[in-house]
Amino acid sequence: MPTQFAPLQNDTFLRALLRQPTEYTPLWLMRQAGRYLPEYRATRARAGSFLGLAKNPDFATEVTLQPLDRYKLDAAILFSDILTVPDAMGLGLYFIEGEGPKFERPLRDEKAVQALKVPELGSLQYVFDAVTQIRTELKGRVPLIGFTGSPWTLACYMVEGGGSDDFRTVKAMLYNRPDLMHHILQTNALTVAAYLNAQIDAGAQAVMMFDTWGGALADGAYQQFSLHYMREVMKHVKTEKDGVRIPSIVFTKGGGLWLKEIAAVGADAVGLDWTVNLGAARAKVGERVALQGNLDPSILFAQPDQIRAEVAKVLESFGKHSAGSGHVFNLGHGISQFTPPEAVTVLVDAVHELSRPLHK
């Protein structure tokens, strides 16, 4: 494995996460390599399937770099899927066109849950190979983000056997058999920490934990079944590699209510969805963590002038930068597959241009 990667030319994103001064507000987009890009759709057709794309380091590298060839983004994010982890745990991941991910062997009874173990990371070598290959081919243009799902979010898919509207099965287990739920979450936490560390060893320069379904939990249950295990993960994730800081981001969609508690989880930055007021969030936790977000992805269906106006609102909501403040611009969730690619050009240019006066 090459230990010598090209020197980083643009570290704005990493500095913002560490609340160091930057010349402008950096940005990247959740799902920036995705179906809204015609070049992504062409590569996916060649790969034959989503898993054919994600499990092949050459294809994964190609699609990771596509948005960077088109837009002046400040970070790349590994092209993969959070469900590679339960797949490695033996649950049998497959995709049905139009229905999304499914598991052949969901965790529905005590026997299945008790059999769950931290997997051999060798079964995820294709992910680590992709990380190293992407980092090499980036040639230092921008940093590379590695990522994982949170223990709770992974558990939702593992128990439900796929996506869900109401999380009935996983919540029934949580309330009826909390002992089984905790066993799943503890196993997931150990796995996820090792998985992120292996991505860091392979070349990831920052890591992010997506708690997509944390917001489905009641207050109280969130702290016990999601937040606690994210804290467990953060305790074990490397904060540096070869003397260089590796910043971390956590993101609970629908987690605005628990902002102060999320900020204390041990990550350098907290991602926000579009329901949160960024300025209010900064007032609450901005001395402690950087913030990432939080434009409504649907704004990208508006006219260019409207996109610029909404970008300005988000930037002004965060306000002028001071010592120890950090903001990474992003959407409040993943970009829609129906987004016109040219809208992203407007967004990127607007963020870079309109944020500069706020950093003086």
From Swiss-Prot:
MF terms in GO: uroporphyrinogen decarboxylase activity
Q: Name one GO cellular component term.
A: cytosol
Q: What is its EC number?
A: 4.1.1.37
Q: Where does substrate bind?
A: 31-35, 81, 157, 212, 333
| PROSITE patterns noted in UniProt | UROD_1, UROD_2
One GO BP on record is: protoporphyrinogen IX biosynthetic process from glutamate
Known catalytic reactions? uroporphyrinogen III + 4 H(+) = coproporphyrinogen III + 4 CO2
The alphabetical list of record keywords is: Cytoplasm, Decarboxylase, Lyase, Porphyrin biosynthesis
Q: Subcellular location, in the record's words?
A: Cytoplasm
State the pathway, as annotated in the record. Answer: Porphyrin-containing compound metabolism; protoporphyrin-IX biosynthesis; coproporphyrinogen-III from 5-aminolevulinate: step 4/4
Name of a matching Pfam family: URO-D
| Superkingdom field | Bacteria
The cross-references to SUPFAM superfamilies, in alphabetical order and at most eight, read:
UROD/MetE-like
Q: Which InterPro entries match?
A: UROD/MetE-like_sf, Uroporphyrinogen_deCO2ase_HemE, Uroporphyrinogen_deCOase
Query: Could you say which residues are annotated as the site Transition state stabilizer?
Result: 81
Annotated function: Catalyzes the decarboxylation of four acetate groups of uroporphyrinogen-III to yield coproporphyrinogen-III.
Entry's family note: Belongs to the uroporphyrinogen decarboxylase family.
What subunit structure does UniProt give? Homodimer.
In its UniProt entry, what is this protein called?
Uroporphyrinogen decarboxylase
According to its UniProt entry, this protein's organism is Janthinobacterium sp. (strain Marseille)
